[in-house]
C-alpha cells in the first residue's frame, strides 16, 4: 500500500528533538569528541555506521571528553537559499506536494528571509525583495513576497553556514519585525489568486476616470466606454484611485448612449470626478471561509484575463473555488492559494520546512582541564542521558572520559597518539597526553595491572603503572 512520510511528521520529529533540551525534566544531551587513533587514511575517513560494535562499544572506548548541550545551543535550520537574480522561484501553493523540495524562499544580504507567494506567471526574479512590512511585498519584476523573519547577528555567528540558516518561531514579543508579522497573520487567508487560463473575447472591460456621479448606485463612465447597451452587465466596477478608493460593486445595468452604469448596491463612500475605476470580469471566491475578494486585471492586447489582485484576504478558508463571469466571455480559470492554517508568517519554522536541527556546543579551551588541547580528534557525536559509573544520571557541565596513569621508573619519553602496551596483561591503549610523571590514555583494550611495565609502541619509552584514575 502506498505511503508517505509527511512534512508534518518530519516537523514533529524535529520538534521533539529540539524540545527535549528545554523541557521541565529535560533529556540530558552531551556532545562528545574522541578518536585520537589515525584512520587507515586520514584524508578519507570511513563512513559512520550504526553497528552495535560502534554505537555501543567503540565510540565509548575512543571517547575523550563530553560537554552538556544546553537549550541555547540548539536551533531549527533550513537549507540556505541566497536570493540570486535570474532565478525562477517556486511560488507557494497549498496543493504543491513537493513545495519543500523546491526553492520557494530566499535570504537577502541583510539576512531578511522572504517566502515567494507569486512568481509573476513563471517569470525570473530580477528585483531583490526588501523591507519588513507585514503586508505582501511586490517587487518591480512582478514577484510577490512575504517577509518572514530576520536572522539575528547572534544566530548568524552561531548557526549560519554555507548550507543552512537558522529559523525560529517566536513565542513572546521580542520587539522584532517578525513578531509583528506573526501577529498580523490571518488563519486560512487567500493572499494569491493565480490565473491558469486567461480565456478569450473579454471585450467588456474599461478603465478611466468617472465623468459624473448620479447617486450612490449610478455612475457615468469615461468617454471611451462602450456605446453597446448592457455590455458591462455582470462585470465588476472597482474604484482604483481618487475619492472612494477600494470599493467593488457589480454592474446590473448599462446604458450605452449615456454611459451610465447602475450598481447592484450603494457605494459606502461617495465618488466624484477624481475617482478612477476599472470595469472587469466579476470574480467570486467560493469556499468555507469568509471575506475574500479579488478583481481581474486584463491584457488589453489579447482581451484575456492576465492576473488577479486580491482586494481582501478573508479568513478561515480550507478550500475555495474561483468563479469568474462576465457578459459574453468565457474560458478563464484561476486557482486560489490558501495560506497555512495559522496564516503566512505565523510559524516560520513549519512554513519554511524547519525539519532539521543544528547543535552548536562550543568547547571553551580545555574546559577547566576536562578537554585536551594538545591532541586532535576524529569523532564527534551526541550522548543521550548518559550515566555515571555509580549509575546516577550525568548532569555536570563537562566530563573527562580518559584514564590517567600515574607512572614511576620512567625511561624515555612517551609521545601522543602512540599505542602503549602492558608487559604483564597484554592490555593496550592510546596516549592522549604525556609528561614525565603520567600519561592520559583512551581506546583502552583490557585492564592494566598496578605495577606492570608499559612500553610505548613508537617511542619505546617504558614505565611502571603506579596509579590509574578514570576521568
Annotate each predicted stretch with a short phrase:
Residues 1-113, 117-471:
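Feature for peripheral, non-core segments
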Amino acid at each position: 500500500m502506498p505511503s508517505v512520510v509527511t512534512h508534518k511528521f518530519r516537523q514533529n520529529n524535529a520538534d521533539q528533538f529540539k524540545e527535549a533540551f528545554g523541557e521541565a525534566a529535560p533529556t540530558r544531551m552531551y556532545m562528545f569528541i574522541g578518536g585520537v587513533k589515525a584512520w587507515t587514511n586520514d584524508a578519507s575517513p570511513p563512513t559512520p555506521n550504526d553497528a552495535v560494535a560502534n554505537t555501543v562499544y567503540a565510540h565509548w572506548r575512543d571517547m575523550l571528553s563530553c560537554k552538556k548541550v544546553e537549550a541555547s545551543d540548539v536551533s531549527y535550520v533550513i537549507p540556505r537559499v541566497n536570493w540570486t537574480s535570474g532565478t525562477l522561484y517556486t511560488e507557494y501553493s497549498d496543493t504543491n506536494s513537493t513545495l519543500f523540495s523546491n526553492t520557494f524562499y530566499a535570504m537577502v544580504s541583510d539576512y531578511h528571509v522572504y517566502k515567494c507567494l507569486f512568481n509573476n506567471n513563471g517569470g525570473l526574479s530580477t528585483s531583490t525583495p526588501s523591507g519588513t512590512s507585514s503586508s505582501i511585498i511586490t517587487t518591480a519584476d512582478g514577484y510577490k513576497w512575504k517577509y518572514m523573519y530576520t536572522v539575528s547577528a547572534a544566530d548568524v555567528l552561531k548557526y549560519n553556514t554555507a548550507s543552512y540558516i537558522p529559523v525560529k518561531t517566536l513565542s513572546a514579543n521580542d520587539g522584532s519585525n517578525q513578531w509583528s508579522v506573526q501577529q498580523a497573520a490571518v488563519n486560512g487567508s487567500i493572499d494569491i489568486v493565480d490565473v491558469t487560463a486567461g480565456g478569450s473575447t473579454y471585450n467588456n472591460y474599461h478603465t478611466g476616470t468617472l465623468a459624473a456621479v448620479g447617486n450612490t448606485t449610478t455612475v457615468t463612465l469615461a468617454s471611451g466606454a462602450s456605446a453597446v447597451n448592457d455590455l458591462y452587465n455582470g462585470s465588476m466596477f472597482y474604484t482604483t484611485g481618487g475619492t472612494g478608493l477600494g470599493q467593488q460593486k457589480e454592474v446590473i445595468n448599462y446604458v450605452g448612449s449615456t454611459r451610465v452604469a447602475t450598481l447592484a448596491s450603494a457605494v459606502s463612500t461617495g465618488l466624484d470626478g477624481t475617482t478612477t475605476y476599472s470595469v472587469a470580469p466579476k470574480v467570486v471566491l467560493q469556499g468555507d471561509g469568509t471575506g475574500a475578494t479579488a478583481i481581474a486585471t486584463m491584457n488589453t492586447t489579447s482581451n484575456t484575463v492576465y492576473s488577479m489582485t486580491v482586494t481582501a484576504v478573508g479568513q478561515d478558508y480550507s478550500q475555495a473555488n474561483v468563479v469568474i463571469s462576465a457578459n459574453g466571455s468565457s474560458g478563464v480559470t484561476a486557482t486560489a492559494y490558501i495560506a497555512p492554517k495559522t496564516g503566512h508568517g505565523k510559524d516560520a519554522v513549519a512554513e519554511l520546512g524547519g525539519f532539521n536541527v543544528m547543535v552548536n556546543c562550543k568547547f571553551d579551551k580545555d574546559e577547566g582541564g576536562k578537554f585536551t588541547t594538545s591532541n586532535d580528534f576524529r569523532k564527534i557525536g551526541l550522548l543521550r542521558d548518559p550515566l555515571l559509573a555509580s549509575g546516577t544520571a550525568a548532569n555536570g557541565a563537562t566530563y573527562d572520559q580518559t584514564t590517567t596513569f600515574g607512572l614511576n621508573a620512567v625511561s624515555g619519553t612517551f609521545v601522543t597518539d602512540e599505542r602503549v602496551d602492558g608487559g604483564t596483561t597484554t592490555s593496550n591503549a592510546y596516549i592522549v597526553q604525556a609528561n614525565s610523571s603520567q600519561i592520559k590514555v583512551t581506546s583502552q583494550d583490557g585492564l592494566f595491572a598496578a605495577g606492570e611495565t608499559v612500553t610505548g609502541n613508537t617511542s619505546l619509552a617504558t614505565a611502571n603503572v603506579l596509579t590509574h584514575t578514570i576521568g
